[in-house]
Curated annotation (Swiss-Prot):
InterPro entries: UPF0178. Transmembrane segments: none annotated. Belongs to the UPF0178 family. This is UPF0178 protein Lmo1456.
Length: 149
C-alpha cells in the first residue's frame, strides 16, 4: 500500500502559502502549515495549522517529527532541508527550487561562510522580493513535480 504524501510548510515566512494550497487542492493532498505562536491567527479557514513555541528551532523540530519518507516540504531553511532530505522527503524552496542531497554540503558551507561574514560586520543583500512571476514559477514547478511523481 503506497502512502499518500503530505505537504509540510515551514510557514513563518513562507510567501507562497496560497500557491501551495491551490496545488494541494488540485492533487487532493493534505497540507500542514507549521509556524511559531508569533504568527498565530484564529483565521485559519479550516486549514491544518500547527503552532509551536517561539524557540529558535521549535518549528524545525516539529517538522522533523512530522515528516515521512515521500512527503513534500517547503522551506527556505537550508539546515532543515538537509535533515529532511536525509529522511527521504522532497524539499522545495519558496522559489520552487527542488533541493538535492548532493548539493547540501556546498549550500551549508556557503551558509556558514555568510554567517561568519555577518559576525564580522559584513552584510550582503538578501534575496529580491517575491514577484508574481516568482510565485507562478513556484506553482508551476510544484505542479510539474507532482504530475511526474
Amino acid at each position: 500500500m503506497e502512502c499518500v504524501p503530505q505537504i509540510l510548510v515551514d510557514a513563518d515566512a513562507c510567501p507562497v502559502k496560497a500557491e501551495i494550497k491551490q496545488v494541494a487542492k488540485e492533487f487532493q493532498l493534505e497540507v500542514t502549515f507549521v509556524a511559531s505562536f508569533n504568527h498565530y491567527s484564529v483565521n485559519t479557514n479550516g486549514e491544518n495549522w500547527i503552532f509551536v513555541d517561539t524557540g529558535k528551532e521549535s518549528a524545525d523540530m516539529r517538522m522533523m517529527n512530522l515528516a515521512k519518507k515521500g512527503d513534500i516540504i517547503v522551506t527556505q531553511d537550508i539546515g532543515l532541508a538537509s535533515i529532511l532530505l536525509a529522511k527521504g522527503t522532497f524539499v522545495f524552496s519558496n522559489r520552487g527550487e527542488l533541493y538535492r542531497e548532493e548539493e547540501m554540503s556546498l549550500m551549508l558551507d556557503i551558509r556558514y561562510r555568510h554567517a561568519k561574514e555577518r559576525q564580522q560586520g559584513k552584510y550582503s543583500k538578501g534575496p529580491k522580493a517575491m514577484s508574481d512571476q516568482d510565485r507562478s514559477l513556484f506553482k508551476d514547478r510544484l505542479t510539474t513535480f507532482l504530475q511526474n511523481k
